[in-house]
């Protein structure tokens, strides 16, 4: 490949189709819109999803599910992250300080990873495996 044999990609230099510029251009009179009908009119744009009067797909399909307004979101922390802290007592304040949870978050501890040594963990929720692993290491899982 040299500068002397570089070429523009196909259709890169093609001119834009100009419609409505006389019969000789082949795109005069109806300007590629055909005769009559909604699409031939000026300012004609069907709304998104319009299917020619047929019931559109988004209205044919049934609505499903709902949003539970009482759902409680938890900040999830795994045991391996708690082990990295190397503390004997872990509270929500400690997790907020180490940026593992937000100020207003409720905390759920999950059992991914191993914890070494007796650790007291205070959180709003624990998974079964997390509770078992903390107890096995000689620690305590306290629910707030």
Curated annotation (Swiss-Prot):
Q: What is this protein called?
A: Large ribosomal subunit protein uL15
Record's subunit section: Part of the 50S ribosomal subunit.
Q: What is this protein's function per UniProt?
A: Binds to the 23S rRNA.
According to its record, what are the GO cellular component terms? cytosolic large ribosomal subunit
Q: Where is the composition biased (Low complexity)?
A: 40-49
The record's listing under PANTHER family reads: 50S RIBOSOMAL PROTEIN L15, LARGE RIBOSOMAL SUBUNIT PROTEIN UL15M
| Stretches for region Disordered | 1-58
Q: Tell me which stretches of the chain form a coiled coil.
A: none
The encoding gene is rplO
Q: Which UniProt keywords apply?
A: Ribonucleoprotein, Ribosomal protein, RNA-binding, rRNA-binding
Q: Which GO terms describe its biological process?
A: translation
Bias (Basic residues) ranges: 8-20
What does the similarity note say? Belongs to the universal ribosomal protein uL15 family.
GO terms of molecular function: rRNA binding; structural constituent of ribosome
